[in-house]
Amino acid sequence: MEFLLSNLVAYIAREMPELILVDEDYGQLENLDDDGQQMYPLTTPAVLIEPSRVDWSHLEGNSQKGEATLRVRLIIDCYDDTHAGSGTEFSIKDREELRHKLHSLLEGYRPLDDGGLMRTQSTFFTYKHGIKVYESIYTCTVTEQMRQGTSYRSTQIRLSMK
């Protein structure tokens, strides 16, 4: 999954220079208040990417195909007062535009030569310290080549009726 991660980090950072941080998600958000945890500081706006799983199937020859699942989180601080009449209600629109731009970049993007990313789920929530999290789950098809000399053979099942 590291091949997906490195590709996506570089792609998002290049296409969205307004982001301060694009990185692998290794718990930075959840450890904001844990001074005992050695981590780089989380600066916003940020995108954190976690390639969480691949469901593999066997293919003939020396490769496997799978469906990869990735969690992508856009993290934005929300210190603006956005109540009606505050004069800063536009901050809500700005956050939505950033979220939409990220999704537009990712939906259909082919990080490798396999299938494009497809969003399957979205969750939006407020986190401590006035942080908004826009989380989306994407899936895509991936193929991994095995080393030479490794191959899969199909198993034939034979039934006889008497």
Segments (PLM) and residue ranges:
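Short, cysteine-centered beta-strand-loop-beta hairpins and adjacent loop/turn segments enriched
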Residues: 56-59, 77-85, 143-151
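Generic secondary-structure microfeatures
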Residues: 51-55, 72-78, 106
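Extracellular/virion structural assembly segments
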Residues: 63-67, 77-104
